[in-house]
Design a protein with these regions (language model features):
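Glycine/serine-rich phosphate-binding loop and adjoining beta1-alpha1 elements at the start
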Residues: 67-204
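Short, Gly/Pro- and small/polar-rich lid/capping loops
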Residues: 1-20
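Glycine-rich phosphate/diphosphate-binding loop of Rossmann-like nucleotide-binding domains
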Residues: 167-282
Length: 299
């Protein structure tokens, strides 16, 4: 098994698309590990210091994910080396998606990822450059639909991911109008953990959790895991951390989700990162959720 994994990790990706912006220092890569099933999928991320190797690694991770959970397509990822707080971010994304438009049209599907918002950035910008939906390429390359089928299915996609959650069981606040895209990845993480403990360890209730990262994935996962009766005992992000060996209550978790500023963990009780990073690994916990940027923290 180890030899197979090493062979998989060391195999060159099928397609690597490299881009250099003409107006800023931004540079980016689309890495498509394979076009298994006629298409590949993986989100778009942006951060300073990102390099091609990180994107390659994430594309391979996406391929493992699709192999396990479907659909049977290849793994891919897009990454842009640029400061997401730069006021030129929207312009950079527009030029990026204009450049990769042919891939997105026929065999590559993308979405939001680290520092790139699916609802407010990916969907409107890709639409502006001529893509019906960020997943159009997967639908075209993998399912090979007729034109009427394509119009119908992509219409359903367009409506589905931006749908506001109306059931109070699935959102920390109806007033905040969280969408499916905001919460679905964290929900999937929580469901995977819940099913694992349901199958092998007499249920998830009471199990203790540490979360690394408090963006869309980490915060949503924390919300749903807490709903299952699991105890979030620690949260660490680049801003700092929160520790409570007894576990944060559901109302406390809800408030931490609602008080986020983008991907930032916000709390009057926030410990400095150095202190939190020293103490959090001494907590007693059964579950660790790595939901931060790649290689952000060292254990």
């Amino acid at each position: 098994m180890k030899e197979l994994l090493e062979k998989f990790e060391n195999k060159r990706p099928e397609i690597v698309f490299e881009w250099k912006d003409t107006e800023t220092p931004a540079e980016g890569w689309v890495v498509i590990n394979s076009l298994r099933g006629g298409a590949a999928g993986g989100g778009t991320r942006m951060r300073m210091g990102l390099d091609k190797r990180e994107v390659e690694s994430l594309a391979k991770t996406m391929e493992v994910k699709f192999t396990v959970s479907g659909p049977p397509i290849g793994g891919a990822k897009s990454g842009i080396n640029f400061d997401p707080n730069d006021p030129r971010k929207a312009e950079v994304l527009h030029r990026w998606y204009a450049a990769v438009m042919p891939l997105l049209k026929y065999y590559y599907g993308t979405g939001g990822d680290l520092n790139v918002d699916e609802i407010h950035e990916v969907i409107p910008i890709t639409e502006d450059v001529g893509i019906w939906h960020p997943q159009e390429g997967v639908f075209t390359g993998h399912y090979k639909p007729s034109e009427p089928q394509k119009v119908n299915r992509i219409g359903q996609l367009r409506q589905g991911v931006v749908k506001v959650i109306e059931d109070p069981r699935f959102t920390p606040s109806l007033e905040k109008k969280y969408t499916i895209a905001d919460m679905c990845t964290g929900y999937g993480v929580a469901q995977a953990v819940g099913h694992y403990y349901g199958l092998w360890h007499n249920g998830a209730k009471g199990k203790r959790v540490v979360l690394q990262g408090w963006g869309n994935v980490g915060a949503a996962a924390g919300f749903y895991l807490s709903q299952m009766g699991m105890k979030v005992v620690g949260i660490i992000s680049k801003e700092g951390g929160l520790i409570n060996q007894a576990g944060f209550g559901q109302e406390e978790i809800n408030r931490l989700v609602l008080d986020r500023q983008g991907n930032k963990l916000v709390s009057p009780d926030l410990l400095p990162f150095e202190i939190a990073n020293e103490k959090i690994w001494d907590l007693e916990f059964e579950v660790f959720i790595p939901a931060a940027a790649s290689a952000t923290f060292l254990l």
